[in-house]
Amino acid sequence: VAAPEEGRTGGKKRKGGNVLEIDGSRHSGSGTLLRYSAALATLLSTPLHMTRIRASRGKTGLRPQHLQALLACSSLSGGEIQGAEVGSTEIYYHPGKSLGHGDFRWDIGTAGSTTMLAFTLIPPALFAKGPSRFTLTGGLFQDSAPSAFHMQHILLPILRRMGAEVHLEILRPGYPPRGEGCLQVEMNPLDGSL
């Protein structure tokens, strides 16, 4: 992969456009930085280059739940990812130019947080051309992530008051260490554009 060129504004350029350059070890160095960066890149159709992913964590690099968030964003936008494998500490993500909608299924394959995956996908899906339904499999109740109940009873009512019609149904509970829980998130896009 060729390194991005310096742009006139000091930002990095790649293939003629701006690139979000993120050091994944910043602040707490958690996977949340990766998930929200991927969501923002997807929303803005702006390439993302992230280095030192989770460098300050015990297990550095992408874990299955982070990889699934990247793959899901790429799937929503028709994008491409380089470095998309468990353990990778550097990725280039090139989102597509339009946001897909419809029925999607993603399985984290571990007890990784389905709610954190949903948090990643809701912002782009709210600006798609039609309604979406996500069926997410993994963990629903962990110590280190908001639970499905928190999302259902705290976050989503706040989003609805803001005009975002997002609903969550718990299809099957899932706990560490196995996960295997399943939730479904349905939403309609917002009126207007970003």
Predicted regions and their residues:
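Structural preference for solvent-exposed beta-strand-turn elements
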Residues: 2-194
